[in-house]
Amino acid sequence: MTEFEQDQYWMQKALEYADKAEQQNEIPVGAVLVKDGELVGAGWNQSICNHDPSAHAEMMAVREAGKKIENYRLIDCTLYVTLEPCPMCAGLLVHSRIKRLVYGAADAKTGSAGSIMNIVKEPKLNHQLEVTSGVMAEQCAEKLSTFFRRRRKEIKEAKRLAKQAAQEE
């Protein structure tokens, strides 16, 4: 299997984990960590469910992988994530010594692997990652867009119902 085919395969797996987040009404981001062609960690956004602002997909996958390989250094691992990491997660990837980051959709608001800043390639830090961006970007971005459209519609409907109930009193 070529690197391109591997990237497609594992990003599809990350999208499946993003579906788990969406089923819990979390922002649909999924991540998988791979070492030597084997899944060693996986996660999806769980910040709302866990009341934990650090429970991003990347964080959950890294925690699981560390336990599985019994090491906090995830050397020679590749992280596949459906959305470009935020500053917190980018820092985590550097500290974890992950070799390679592959992400789908760019994040113009908090993207820290090239969009608004580039923590994962910062030369002042003691580790930099190889980065491949835009893998299955359209599918990843569409999943997020669909989620936020639905969420805005639900919020609008809830406001309408609240206003209607207030008028009936």
Task: Enumerate the predicted regions with their spans.
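Short beta-strand scaffold segments in enzyme catalytic cores
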Residues: 29-37
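Residues at secondary-structure transition points
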Residues: 5, 27-28, 48-56, 60, ...
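Helix-adjacent hinge/juxtasegments
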Residues: 55, 59, 63-100
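Short, basic and Ser/Thr-rich N-terminal targeting/leader segments
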Residues: 25-29, 75
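Zinc-dependent deaminase
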Residues: 1-21, 92-169
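Short beta->alpha transition motifs characteristic of CBS
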Residues: 40-47
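Residues that line or immediately flank small-molecule/substrate-binding pockets and catalytic motifs
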Residues: 47, 81, 105
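Small-residue (primarily alanine) positions within well-ordered alpha-helices
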Residues: 14, 18-21, 31, 57, ...
